Structure formats: structure tokens, C-alpha cells
Amino acid sequence: MPSDWDDDEGMPEMRPERPARRRGPSRGQIMRRRLVALGSIVVVVVAVIIVLSSSGGDDGSGRPTAHPSQAKKVAHKTKAKKAASGKVTNATPQADWVPHRGPVPILEYHDLGSPPEGEPYPELFVGRDDFAKQMDWLEERGYEAVTLEQVQEAWYHGGKLPPKPIVLSFDDGYRPQFTFALPTLKEHGWAGVLNLKAEGSDLYESNVKAMIAAGWELAAHTIHHLDLTELGPEEVEEEVAGSRKILQREYDVPVDNFCYPSGQFDEAVVKAVEEAGYTGATTEISGFAERGKPFELARLEILRETHVGGLAADLKNEEGETAEGGG
């Protein structure tokens, strides 16, 4: 026994052996593995191409077309994306917009929902389901909502509009125009025109600002919503010019269009509107708005009993008359 061992300590501690190093694959093995992996990727890509090409049709142009069910899914996703973004897609001209100098339909809405008991004008309350269905119907038929300012830019300054433009106007400033019309139009990527009376509306200042931020146009509807044809010259000027000044001061945006309360106007009222600096004015004359009548712009009033069928008939009738008249 070696002399340096100690009986009390026993045998000296032995260090564990290190595991043996594994020998790495050779260069040839590495190359073979890479080739196998590459081959697998190619097979997967080819399979995906075959599946995609077989799922679509052909529209005669050599481009695959989506199955109808796929098209609906894409449309639904696009609509949801517009709503989530909160952005208005028609705020600026799109690639398919074209010069337009012909008539344009302007729809006229008031309140949305069920009329309260004792309401003197229940016909002005369009059901919310009806309103949503009308917006869906318009989009399905290719209509795109724009503001009146955009129409005037196309009419008088060489601007462009969608192939089937339409203006959605909302009078007076009812609360559901903010709580329901605003989000509904957002789903379609559209904006409306708010014809706001300067005093006495149901909308808060923050509501109006939110609508403007979403791309809506702000138009004047007098201060107190009075019949202008029954007022004297000074009162007319106060209601017409004064409402524009109030709205521009409160919301810091251009207010270039006017809406006659209850559609009432005469030569003196029209003159006051022109002198106040407005570009145009909407009426309750039934029909399409025409470029040659900037201060007598016709509209299609949508009432509680209009529904989708009535809207479709109104648009079809007016389009037919426009075509017959050489539009």
C-alpha cells in the first residue's frame, strides 16, 4: 500500500470520466440531408399550387376566380377590416374613380329607430335594421358613398368619383346618427353628410367632432331650424350666414353646403345662401342632384316605410328618367 494513503480517509476520490465526444457527420452526410430537406419543401410547394389552382375557376381572362363561398368570406373579412381600422376608404380618390359631371343621388335621412309614443312625425324614423339592410344593398349593387364636397369637386373642378356615387345625408343632428349611422357606415368604409342645426340638436360637440374625424362632411341647417320663407331679410341672413359662422368656429372645418329646413326656400332665401358663401344647398325636391342646379339640389327622402324595395325603386326610376333625359 502506498505510504501517502490515509486509513481514516480511505481511497482517494476518483474524478468521473468525461463522456466521449461523438464524431460529427461527414460532409457527404450533411449534403445528403440538405438534399432530402429541399426535396420535401419542393413537394409541399407543388401540392399547395395544385390545391389552389383546382379551387378556383377561370373568368376567361386566364386569371383564376374565387368560388362564390370564398368571395363572400373575402368580402366579410374586408368589411370587418374596414370597421376595425375606423378609416374611411373613400376619403381620397381610388384607382377606379372616373371623371363625373352627371347627376348624383343624395339620400335624405332623419332619425333612426322606433318613434316614441306621441311622436308627431313617426315617418321620419327609419328602422335601424332597415337602415343597415339599405346600406348593405347599396354596396352589393356597386354604390359607393361620397360627400357632397367630393361631388362638387368632380362637377366643377375636374375631380373624380366612384363609378356609382351616392351621397348619404342626415338632417338636424339626432343622437342615433352618431350612435348607429356612424358605425354602420364605417363598416362599409363610407362617410355621410351631417346637416346640423347650430343650436338644439341631440348631438354633443364631441359626437360631431368624432363624425368629422371619421370623414363626414359638416353642412349648415340654420341655427334654429325655422321656415326661412316666413322670415324677414335680417333674420334670414342671421340663420343662413350665422349658422355657417358658428359651425366653422366651433369645429374648425369648412362649412360650404347648406340644407333648407323642411325644404322651404324661395328666391330671397337662395340669394341669401349664395351671398353667405355656400357652394350649394340641398332641398326636399325628389330626384337626383344635378350640376346645373347647385342651390336646388334634389334628394331622395327615405322614410320609415321605404325599406330596401322602396329605395331600389326610387333609384331605378330616377336612373331611368336620367337616361331618357340624356343625363
Walk through the language-model features, giving the residues of each.
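C-terminal region of N-terminal signal peptides and the immediate post-cleavage residues
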Residues: 48-70
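Core hydrophobic alpha-helical transmembrane segments of single-pass membrane proteins
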Residues: 38-48
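C-terminal active-site subregion of NodB/CE4 polysaccharide deacetylases
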Residues: 67-73, 77, 81-169, 174-180, ...
